[in-house]
Amino acid sequence: MKPVGEFDHDYCRKIQSACLKAILEASIDPATNTATLRNGEISKALLRISAMLMATSKEASSPTQIRHLAETYAKGCRQLITANRASMDKDGGPPFPVLHQAASNS
């Protein structure tokens, strides 16, 4: 693991993999042994976790810094959505079935 303060891509991939595994395990219906991935609920849960973690950083110590942090996060999110969408379009769709639903504000 790299020193704190230096971005560790391997650690990032490890956390990403653990999160996806936890999402799949939490989504399994034991009666059918299938997992329905509910995008709205998953996205909201991950956003809440991200916000909690970001709130602990020194970069979130003032309203101006919080706004900058949120704008940087939103920009990264847009870039990742665009890249993932392009990859799915190229590959013929997502790697799993998706249940589309309206997003809620819960």
Regions found by a protein language model. Give the residues of each.
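Solvent-exposed interaction surfaces and binding hotspots enriched for charged
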Residues: M1-S106
